[in-house]
């Protein structure tokens, strides 16, 4: 059975002020990837530092694709400021455990080895879950290239509070159905996809990269600066472009968000159906988990994803089918090089306003035609976002992008005023003011600011990265932890190794868990 779409009349039944008062109580979580580098900006060749705990089982600090690619995760919290502070504590802890290394401040990678296979995959020990993680990463390298997988980013996890949902849906929490909650989050996801190009312009920080990332650009045209730097003049987020986290193979799958059933059905197809090119990779043992379009659900690239927390060895799709959507994961944020922790409060506050607007506006199903138009908008902004002449698709006609973006940002102000009224601060209105400046002057966007500085100072991308990384290291070396943080992190380091050892004592499983509830 398809879940019902929320209508504007349903939205208007509930007082906007009451809704927004409760919206302040949403839950937030942050994940951030960062490369460990040597003082000269080259990728670290060392294993994951033992003092940071096990990269398999530590709750706060793991590794992503590559062994030197740190992945931080904060607890879900009712105030995003607490997430940022926790992320800061994790950086302080890391810097004080690293001997002579730095944390790279950009989404685009540092100086990479000449041979792609010299980029070390994450290593997680001899347990079956640890081995699967490394095999999965080996498969990613075969499919998309190891260089591409070294791009890092920030993920913002968001869920509405139960009090907010009770007010919005007009019923007691005990009467919620998973279908209603899932429908609400899919409503938000569809509208977010209709607005994500605005967020990409405002937060994109990757218009430039080191040539070792893309030694042979092929037909893609980049400008060269000095000896080692390539850039695209008006680009905002090359991380989200075809040289980053996109896949033409995945684009053929037709995965949409019009209903949970449709989404899960297409994802089930993707994780169970072999793709001819990938079949050949499986000739070598442990080359990949399987030859399917997606080895596992996490391989799917999208600016936003519906999520449910799996239990034990449960697959994410089974978790979604059993319990519905619990939260959404926004994956379109570049690392902010002008924030030591890689993300700033103003950008997250503005993102929250977009999510609220996405909920409080009608959100019809996305047709194939609209899906094409939305992808065209996003791709245009990725490559030409700071071009003052850029036009995008808006309701079937072309509009100047910067005019449309400024107008949209200003339209969120009435939400911001109500939220600020209930928090007693001007956080949300200041977030809008912060973004409006970027619409008035593209050089104030992080992508414009970064590229302008590199060109005007006549320095290399790698030089700017080292400079920022050293500044951040000095700052984190002097900052104080939040109370109790050091003891908590030291205990987690010990606990993570104990759990890893227990996993390695268990009987080895030979097959990755299958999705039980798929019909494919």
Curated annotation (Swiss-Prot):
Keywords: ATP-binding, Glutathione biosynthesis, Ligase, Nucleotide-binding. GO terms for molecular function: ATP binding; glutamate-cysteine ligase activity; metal ion binding. One of its GO terms (biological process) is glutathione biosynthetic process. Its EC number is 6.3.2.2. InterPro entries: Gln_synth/guanido_kin_cat_dom, Glu_cys_ligase, Glut_cys_ligase. It catalyses: L-cysteine + L-glutamate + ATP = gamma-L-glutamyl-L-cysteine + ADP + phosphate + H(+). Pathway: Sulfur metabolism; glutathione biosynthesis; glutathione from L-cysteine and L-glutamate: step 1/2. Belongs to the glutamate--cysteine ligase type 1 family. Type 1 subfamily. This is Glutamate--cysteine ligase. The lineage of its organism: Bacteria, Pseudomonadati, Spirochaetota, Spirochaetia, Leptospirales. The gene is gshA.
């Amino acid at each position: 059975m398809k879940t019902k779409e929320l209508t504007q009349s349903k939205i208007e039944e509930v007082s906007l002020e009451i809704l927004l008062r409760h919206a302040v109580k949403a839950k937030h979580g942050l994940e951030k990837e960062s490369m460990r580098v040597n003082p000269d900006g080259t990728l670290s060749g060392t294993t994951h530092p033992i003092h940071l705990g096990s990269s398999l089982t530590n709750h706060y600090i793991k590794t992503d694709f590559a062994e030197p690619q740190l992945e931080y995760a904060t607890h879900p919290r009712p105030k995003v400021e607490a997430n940022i502070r926790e992320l800061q504590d994790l950086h302080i802890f890391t810097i004080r455990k690293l001997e002579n290394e730095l944390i790279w401040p950009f989404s685009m990678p540092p100086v990479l080895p000449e041979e792609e296979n010299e980029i070390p995959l994450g290593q997680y020990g001899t347990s079956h879950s640890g081995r699967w993680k490394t095999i999965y990463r080996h498969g990613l390298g075969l499919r998309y290239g190891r260089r591409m997988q070294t791009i890092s980013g920030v993920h913002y996890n968001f869920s509405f509070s139960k009090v907010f949902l009770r007010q919005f849906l007009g019923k007691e929490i005990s009467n919620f159905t998973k279908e209603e909650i899932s429908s609400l989050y899919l409503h938000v996801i569809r509208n977010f996809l209709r607005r994500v190009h605005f967020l990409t312009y405002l937060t994109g920080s990757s218009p430039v990269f080191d040539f070792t990332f893309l030694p042979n650009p092929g037909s893609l045209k980049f400008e060269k600066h000095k000896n080692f730097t390539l850039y695209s003049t008006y680009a905002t987020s090359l991380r989200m472009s075809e040289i980053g986290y996109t896949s033409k193979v995945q684009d053929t799958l037709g995965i949409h968000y019009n209903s949970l059933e449709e989404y899960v059905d297409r994802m089930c197809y993707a994780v169970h159906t072999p793709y001819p090119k990938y079949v050949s990779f499986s000739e070598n043992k442990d080359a990949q988990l399987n030859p399917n379009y997606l080895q596992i659900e996490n391989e799917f690239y999208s600016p936003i994803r519906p999520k449910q927390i799996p239990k034990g060895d449960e697959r994410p799709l089974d978790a979604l089918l059993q319990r519905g959507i619990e939260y959404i994961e926004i994956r379109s944020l570049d690392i902010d090089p002008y924030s030591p922790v890689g993300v700033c409060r103003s950008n997250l506050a503005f993102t929250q306003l977009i999510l609220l607007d996405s909920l409080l506006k009608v959100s019809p199903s996305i047709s194939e035609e609209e899906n094409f138009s939305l992808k065209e908008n996003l791709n245009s902004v990725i490559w030409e976002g700071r071009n003052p002449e850029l036009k995008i698709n808006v309701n079937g006609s072309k509009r100047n992008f910067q005019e449309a973006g400024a107008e949209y940002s200003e339209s969120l102000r009435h939400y911001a005023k109500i939220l600020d009224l209930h928090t007693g601060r001007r956080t949300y209105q200041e977030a809008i003011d912060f973004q409006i400046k970027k619409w008035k002057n593209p050089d104030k966007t992080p992508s414009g600011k970064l590229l302008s500085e590199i060109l005007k100072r006549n320095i290399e991308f790698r030089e700017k990265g080292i400079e920022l990384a050293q500044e951040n290291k000095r700052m984190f070396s002097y900052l104080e932890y939040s109370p109790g943080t050091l003891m908590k992190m030291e205990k987690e380091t010990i606990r993570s190794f104990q759990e890893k050892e227990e996993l390695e004592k268990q009987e080895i499983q030979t097959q990755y868990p299958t999705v039980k509830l798929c019909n494919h």
